[in-house]
Amino acid sequence: MAVSEAGYESIMINCNPETVSTDYDTSDRLYFEPLTFEDVMSVIDIEKPKGVIVQFGGQTPLKLAQALKNAGAPIIGTQPESIDQAEDRELFKSMVQELDLLQPYNEVATNLEEAIVNAKRVEYPLVVRPSYVLGGRAMEIVYNDDELKTYMTEAVKVSNQSPVLLDHFLNKAIEVDIDAVSDGKNILIGGLMEHIEQAGVHSGDSSCSIPAFSLSNELQREIIRQMKEFTKKLGVIGLVNAQFAVRKDKIFVLEVNPRASRTVPFVSKATGLQLAKIAAKVMIGISLKEQGYLDQIIPDFYSVKGPVFPFNKFPDTDPILGPEMKSTGEVMGTGKTFGEAYIKSQYAAGIHIPDKGKVFISVREPDKNEKLIELGRFLSNEKFEIIATTGTANFLNENHIECQQINKVREGSPHIVELIKSKDIELIINTTEGKQSIEESFSIRAEAVISGITYYTSLEAAYATLSSFDFLGDISVNRLQDYNTENG
């Protein structure tokens, strides 16, 4: 629509069959074709466009950009050479070092022996993945050599042409997403999103908030500064997304994507900025200054994006979250406070937060911390009855939080799954790590799904509910347009 407003005809190529019913009036002409080099070039040969935009189709069009340009297609916006610099592992690492910024230590491996050697250098835990993935497919977090061997031999096919990437996993880090638009001179920060789940959960599966709810203003300013450095260095024209991780006040860049990300619609709704439209105009030569968009808009209200999962339809799928994306949709909650926005997003996703009853808690060792103590005290004060497995129960009791101990399944009856089946549990908080522990606790999460019991597989998500209890049963409904009248 942006290019149509500027006096150009717009042509869309979409491989989704649903495009015939959803996008038929969005462009002047719509092609329902596979996104392959041959099919796209056939359309280009017929239409002879003045410009080809590859930023709005996710990862697939980016991979075609260089071949299309080599074949004579007039790519507008960020050029293929810049796309390669962001996508290529070694080129990106060199750029990070040149800018004197931080990145999780990483190596590549083309066989099992090389992976074991490089893992020692990178240090466990590791995020392991094939070199080219969509939606985090075949990505895992491994904690030792045995798990790495299993991954290398069973999960992926490795070769010189298809190496496996080994990244040091930043445990207990806060992940941050930024969407921005650049015209090559000025950069508009669309929105900085703080994730609720820790780094290591796929960004599509993590809830996130605009504005940030816990990061200091100083950290946010530094993240934005680094974002602008990457954007300038890459020569971005149009949209760009970057993901960062913050641990102990140190900022690590995870990746930079010179394209529209899945968060653009959320950011646009939360801020009132039509980022896709602004970026399209930038790519056809209308600067940010000419459009009147130079300053970041920080809303005076909170918006929380929440994922929607299909686990009730697939009870054999483990609902524990990790690097591989499992959500199939998303919702948005808006409120004057983070707590109000968060509980609205939970309700919209079909998650009921109980206000009393029995809560089962079993957490991994790194989660036995101040957040768990605060959460336990809060639940106890709210008249919840806490039940926990031995290690978690000992930790809570040592910190003067009353709880009842119950067996894990492998410890024999009476155990937690029996209690869940009896419909005597209202809330489950179950975090775990390591292949064996995840497999042993699967029955807890599976039974929670079958029984329709609210559960959290990350301490951070459970902790976020603390600020929401004031709004239980007291949800106000407001039009999004009323929040964004100033941003039009």
Language model: regions and residue ranges:
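ATP-binding N-terminal substructure of ATP-dependent carboxylate-amine bond-forming enzymes
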Residues: 1-101, 110-117, 336-485
